[in-house]
A protein has these predicted regions:
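Walker A/P-loop-proximal flanking segment of P-loop NTPase domains
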Residues: 2-90
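Conserved P-loop NTPase mechanochemical-coupling segment
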Residues: 10-19, 111-170, 198-207
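P-loop NTPase motor core
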Residues: 11, 16, 27, 66-136
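Alpha-helical scaffold elements adjacent to nucleotide-binding pockets in ATP/GTP-utilizing enzyme cores
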Residues: 34, 52, 56-64, 118-130, ...
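A generic secondary-structure signal for well-formed alpha-helical elements
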Residues: 39, 61-72, 127-135, 184, ...
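Conserved helicase/translocase P-loop NTPase motor core
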Residues: 165-187
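Walker B catalytic acidic pair
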Residues: 193-197
Length: 208
């Protein structure tokens, strides 16, 4: 009799990859329910040492909660990912939460420059890349003309990397949340990973 030994997902932090490629995975999916139903907090800060799986956990949240933007009624990928996981036994919770929310997921791990100028440009690039996920907003009938102009600025790298437009960058996540809420008529979930990296680098290199 032979047994199949699953590979360890060393260095892998993408939930979909781990599940689809059949890597070894400790099922912590019921944590989704404890966070999004059993905990009434509007804001949750997850603090754990490095390499404790925070990024994978947040990626798992995104995979479970996020709408299919091409077809919001299509849950086929969600079902494929979670059908053999513990959370899928929670039928009422899955019906209410799985694939039901617009999700903004952003990581600041690459905003780690040696000076403010470069860090600011990294941040502008990060915001521009994020806007690429939501290009459907450009044609949304729910957004006003001014909303669409504001979104276009969030999709313009040169504009974002110009320090004269600092307020646009500062308010970018607030704008994304507003636009997605208007488009879908649903609360937006914001996931922020590695939020401390820019702060640590700014402190280390004295441009905080």
């Amino acid at each position: 009799m032979s047994s199949h030994i699953l590979q360890l997902p060393t260095g892998k932090q993408d939930f979909k990859t781990i599940v689809k490629d059949n890597y070894y995975f400790v099922d912590k999916t019921k944590y989704i329910k404890s966070v999004f139903q059993d905990d009434s907090s509007q804001v949750l800060l997850i603090t754990r040492p490095r390499r404790f799986g925070k990024t994978l956990t947040m990626n798992m949240f995104e995979s479970f909660l996020s709408l299919n933007y091409d077809d919001p009624n299509d849950l086929s990928e969600h079902i494929e990912l979670f059908k053999d996981k513990e959370i899928y036994k929670e039928k009422e919770f899955c019906e209410k939460f799985m694939g039901k929310y617009p999700v903004i997921s952003i990581t600041f791990k690459d905003v780690k420059a040696l000076n403010f100028k470069d860090a600011y440009e990294d941040l502008g690039e990060l915001i521009c890349d994020l806007s690429d996920k939501f290009l459907f907003l450009k044609d949304s009938p729910k957004l006003t003309f001014n909303d669409k102009k504001a979104f276009a600025k969030l999709n313009d790298l040169d504009y974002l990397q110009n320090k004269r437009h600092l307020n646009t960058v500062k308010n970018s996540l607030k704008k994304f949340i507003s636009f997605l809420y208007k488009h879908f008529g649903q609360k937006v979930i914001l996931l922020i990973d590695e939020y401390d990296v820019p702060l640590a680098k700014a402190s280390q290199f004295n441009y905080y």
